[in-house]
């Protein structure tokens, strides 16, 4: 029973991440510009995590100074920069396109791991990379019709995949020394402080005085940032990491469905095939982590 509860936590986390685009667009309609949306996601999340951990898990505040560069990298590149490029992508492309481009990240992790740790690049990994690249071509409109996003938006999407992939690299080093909650807290410590550089209070204050602004900000922080990280982390206590990664790929599905339901976005057969290809590539990579998955 405990195992199924852990699976449910992972699914909840992934579905919550799928709401990022919804609240991002709500903030945009309230007049919150891109710079301030980066601040709204990261700084309040840092403050909220600080309060939660101060009450329930104070040990996360204790790390060795020599390990701070790990958290600086994950916070400033993997979270803060990711927020900026991903939000830009979502404004230039459909939510489905933005989500699927983001999920090219596992393929990039394979390449980075091979370069950094000499991890073997097997036939299965090559097949997964090709599937992901085909999926990218399909969902972006390079294959099968007109582009479903601007070239600028597609570049932002690829950049978001790179930033997302770097979190796995930094986490490899961070989790070798600390638990998951400590990794999350210090990542958002630097992401939150770094996001102050994006704050334009004179422009943000009027937007936050509206119902749309408050609702969008609260949703982005609680539903699309803090809760998914806490749910996903809780789920990892009872689910093997590779399986959790596969389950978490319901995020692009959730984002696509939310785009259809809330924004009346159209899912062509090519976009659907692209989603299948990208997720198929991720599934191949995760399967290789099992004892019977070598190829």
Where are each of the predicted segments found?
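Small-residue-rich packing faces within the transmembrane alpha-helices of Major Facilitator Superfamily
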Residues: 18, 43-47, 133, 189-193, ...
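Specific transmembrane alpha-helical segments of multi-pass solute transporters/efflux pumps
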Residues: 21, 50-96, 138, 221-239
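Glycine-/small-residue-enriched transmembrane alpha-helix faces in small-molecule transporters
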Residues: 1-40, 146-173, 293-295
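Loop-to-transmembrane-helix transition segments
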Residues: 5-15, 40, 60-85, 151-160, ...
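Hydrophobic transmembrane alpha-helices of multi-pass small-molecule transport proteins
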Residues: 49, 72, 121-142, 195, ...
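Helix-helix packing/entry segments at the starts of transmembrane helices
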Residues: 8, 40, 79, 83, ...
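C-terminal transmembrane-helix exit sites in multi-pass transporters
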Residues: 48, 53, 86, 105-130, ...
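Membrane-interface helix termini and inter-helical loops of multi-pass transporters
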Residues: 22-34, 60-61, 91, 140-152, ...
